[in-house]
């Protein structure tokens, strides 16, 4: 009886820890809302800059759509990685990978860490662990997330008008993300297909 009581108490504590108060939720969403206005370098097929929020949403959709290829992966964890991966840009804006310096990365990491630590538990601890796992890129989920993150950007460039590309992107469309897909034949094939689409787009001139 006593053991059962202890288990019930432990469950009650966990439920209390996991509760995010309504006001804190609204404040947290207000930070995330900034990503709707934070534009990325790439354009959409409609001719406007895409937002960080749009990139993150489609990245999460990609993760879901390819999940059958990785039955051993934890889809819930993978989706969380995709959803939170660019929240740091709510504080700094998006800086293209080819322009981002180590100082930029350090500033973003510091601001993000401060914000994450302001969240209630277990969200602060879970997000801290997820960011560390994503940075290490040793787990299957982290590898899938990073490969798709790069590939989503490449696909978006293929969907934009060639007139919006800057000179260095002609090479980046051939090489960007190549080092992130070797863990999976599926990801390698997907990257190859996107590269062929880029070549066809360049040849067509549109």
Residues covered by each model-derived region:
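Active-site helical microenvironments for divalent-metal-assisted chemistry
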Residues: 14-206
């Amino acid at each position: 009886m006593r053991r059962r009581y202890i288990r019930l108490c432990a469950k009650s504590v966990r439920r209390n820890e996991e509760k995010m108060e309504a006001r804190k939720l609204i404040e947290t969403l207000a930070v995330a809302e900034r990503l709707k206005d934070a534009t990325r370098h790439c354009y959409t097929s409609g001719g406007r800059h895409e937002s960080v929020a749009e990139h993150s949403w489609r990245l999460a959709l990609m993760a879901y759509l390819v999940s059958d290829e990785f039955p051993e992966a934890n889809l819930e964890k993978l989706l969380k990685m995709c959803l939170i991966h660019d929240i740091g840009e709510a504080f700094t804006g998006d800086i293209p990978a080819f322009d981002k310096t180590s100082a930029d990365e350090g500033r973003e990491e510091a601001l993000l860490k401060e914000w994450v630590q302001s969240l209630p538990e277990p969200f602060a601890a879970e997000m801290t662990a997820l960011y560390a796992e994503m940075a290490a890129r040793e787990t299957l989920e982290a590898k899938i997330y990073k490969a798709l993150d790069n590939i989503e950007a490449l696909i978006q460039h293929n969907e934009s008008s060639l007139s919006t590309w800057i000179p260095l992107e002609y090479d980046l469309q051939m090489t960007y993300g190549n080092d992130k897909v070797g863990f999976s034949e599926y990801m390698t094939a997907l990257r190859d297909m996107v590269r062929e689409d880029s070549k066809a787009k360049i040849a067509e001139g549109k």
